A protein has these predicted regions:
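Acyl-donor (CoA/ACP) binding surface of acyl/acetyltransferases
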Residues: 1-37, 41-48, 83-170
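Residue-level detector of secondary-structure transition/capping positions
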Residues: 43-46, 57, 73
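Conserved GNAT-fold acetyl-CoA-binding loop/helix
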Residues: 50-70
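Generic recognition of well-ordered alpha-helical segments
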Residues: 67-71, 130-133
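Short loop/turn motifs at secondary-structure junctions and domain boundaries
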Residues: 74-79
Length: 170
């Protein structure tokens, strides 16, 4: 069986388990032990998040949150993706992740969300910038696809600040 994480050069690359963004802000791979804190954050922000996140109704209980994190861990182990908790001052304030990884075509798709009380501080932009840097420089990926609703003005603004260009809408 082939190793799940690899590049075309044969080097074995794996997304890092933790990425420092800047002072007090870092990305930490989601773990089952994060389920309670993450679910509480989802519940606290459910009305706000409902506007743009179609998966929201798939996480209605702590057990479903645990199941989601377990699925993310399996994707990570199989080289299909990675999901990070965005931590600001040690507390989870949202998530950012590679929803899919395609090492053969050197591309990945990113998605994210952040609590309403943490918006407008550049946290998502800085987190995505660090993740892009990791993907390009450490994982040898060349294409970073932002997966966000075109109606989500804040996400479109993040894409603009990161220098992304609109290539199409699916």
């Amino acid at each position: 069986m082939a190793e799940p994480f690899h590049s075309q050069t044969g080097a074995h690359n794996r997304p890092m388990e933790s990425l420092i963004v800047d002072t007090g802000l870092y990305l930490d791979i989601l773990k089952i032990s994060d389920a309670e804190e993450l679910f509480a954050l989802v519940e606290e922000n459910r009305l706000y998040l409902r506007k743009t996140l179609p998966w929201l109704d798939e996480v209605r209980s702590l057990d479903e949150q645990i199941s989601y994190i377990s699925h993310c861990q399996t994707d990570y182990e199989n080289g299909k993706g990675v999901m990070y908790a965005i931590r600001n001052g040690g507390r989870i304030v949202g998530t950012v992740g590679l929803n899919w990884l395609d090492f053969e075509n050197k591309s990945c798709g990113v998605g994210y969300w952040i609590s309403e009380h943490q918006t407008g501080q550049g946290i998502v932009t800085r987190s995505c910038s660090r993740l892009i840097d990791h993907c390009f420089n450490d994982l040898n990926l060349h294409r970073f696809v932002l997966e966000a609703s075109v109606e989500n003005v804040a996400s479109c603004n993040v894409a603009d600040r990161l220098g992304m260009r609109l290539e199409g809408v699916n």
